[in-house]
């Protein structure tokens, strides 16, 4: 396993999240799926909050200075800072896991699967965000919709 490639994959995933966040206007953070559930801002917050949940379970010392994003007062600056910082903390967890037998505490089977799990979870929420914006009548630019798949240029 190449530790650097694993960490770079995680970094790419987060850059895709930030790319999508940048494409959503502040007022569209309130857009929600027709089937209810979280709005766009809450979806981004959930991504951050799930990272914190895993840090608490696997590397609680990395949680210092972090707080969960609550439903009220969600704005793009808070989301950008939170996603950037929680991604860096997950990166620390990955580096630690790679250097300590490839295991993430409280997750099976190994660190590579953990990156796959987090990436899949976050990609699911990116799709929820895109659908919510579209269903609310605020289509994202096609460049962005294709751009989230261009990992080689992110």
Locate each region found by the language model.
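Basic/polar N-terminal segments that are highly enriched at the extreme N-terminus
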Residues: 1-4
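Short, contiguous alpha-helical
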Residues: 7-11, 15-21, 28-68, 105-154
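Helix-adjacent hinge/juxtasegments
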Residues: 56-96
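Acidic catalytic patch
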Residues: 92-108
